[in-house]
C-alpha cells in the first residue's frame, strides 16, 4: 500500500471521495500526470485535453484530499512523496469496483513467491466461484510492448484462472496495436487460433476466456460487458 496514495488520505471519508473521483477518466489522467510531473508540474504542461478551469477544479479536489499543496505561480508540492506513479492506486480502484459493483472478493497487488512467471498479479477476484485475473495498464498503448503482453499470458498460463482481463486505462483504440500484440502472444503460446475477436466496440476476447478492453464509455460498463460475455458464454454456449 505504500506505493499508493491511500496512506496519505487522512480519513475514511477522503478514501470514499477519492473512489468517487477516480470514476472520472479526466481526473485519473490529471492524477497520473501530476504524479509523473511532480515539481515540474505547470497547468499548461497537461496539454489540450484539459481546460484551465478543469485543471484548477481538479487541483483543488486533490489539495482537499491532502495529496498536494498548491503554491504561487501555479506550481504544486506533492505530499505523497513515496508514490511515483498511478499504477498501484489504479489497481486498488479496480479491485474496489469489483467489490462494490459486482460483489466480488478481490485482492490487488498480489505477489505469489516462487513462480516462474514472476508471480505479480495486479488484481485477483472471485466472482460466482470463478477466479478472475485482471491486469491493469495505465500507460497509453504506444508505451505497451510485446514483452508485457507475453508476460501477462505467462502469468495466465501459470495461474490458470477461469478467465482473465487486460484493462487499459485509455480512450484510445485497442484494435490498432494491442489486439495484434495479444494475438501474437497467444500464437507464440501455441494457440493456432489465437486471433482476438471483437465483442463490442473496443472490447475483444479470445475464446471468451481472455479479454482486452479500455476505459472508453467507462470502466464499469466495459467490465460488465466482459463479465456478461464470459458467464453467458459459459452457461448458454
What spans do the regions from the language model cover?
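Intrinsically disordered, low-complexity Ser/Thr/Pro/Gly-rich regulatory segments
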Residues: 1-237
Amino acid at each position: 500500500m505504500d506505493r499508493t496514495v491511500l496512506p496519505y488520505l487522512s480519513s475514511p471519508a477522503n478514501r470514499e471521495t477519492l473512489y468517487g473521483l477516480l470514476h472520472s477518466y479526466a481526473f485519473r489522467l490529471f492524477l497520473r500526470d501530476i504524479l509523473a510531473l511532480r515539481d515540474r508540474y505547470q497547468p499548461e504542461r497537461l496539454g489540450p485535453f484539459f481546460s484551465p478551469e478543469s485543471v484548477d477544479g481538479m487541483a483543488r479536489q486533490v489539495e482537499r484530499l491532502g495529496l498536494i499543496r498548491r503554491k504561487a505561480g501555479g506550481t504544486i508540492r506533492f505530499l505523497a512523496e513515496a508514490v511515483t506513479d498511478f499504477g498501484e492506486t489504479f489497481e486498488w480502484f479496480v479491485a474496489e469496483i469489483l467489490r462494490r459493483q459486482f460483489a466480488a472478493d478481490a485482492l490487488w497487488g498480489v505477489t505469489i513467491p516462487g513462480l516462474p512467471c514472476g508471480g505479480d498479479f495486479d488484481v485477483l477476484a472471485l466472482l460466482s466461484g470463478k477466479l478472475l485475473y485482471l491486469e491493469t495498464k495505465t500507460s497509453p498503448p504506444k508505451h505497451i510492448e510485446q514483452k508485457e503482453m507475453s508476460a501477462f499470458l505467462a502469468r495466465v498460463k501459470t495461474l490458470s484462472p477461469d478467465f482473465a482481463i487486460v484493462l487499459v486505462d485509455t480512450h484510445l483504440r485497442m484494435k490498432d496495436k494491442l489486439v495484434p500484440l495479444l494475438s501474437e502472444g497467444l500464437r507464440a503460446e501455441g494457440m493456432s487460433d489465437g486471433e482476438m475477436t471483437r465483442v463490442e466496440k473496443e472490447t475483444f476476447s479470445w475464446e471468451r476466456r481472455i479479454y482486452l478492453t479500455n476505459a472508453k464509455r467507462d470502466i464499469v460498463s466495459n467490465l460488465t460487458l466482459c463479465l456478461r460475455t464470459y458467464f453467458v458464454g459459459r452457461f448458454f454456449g
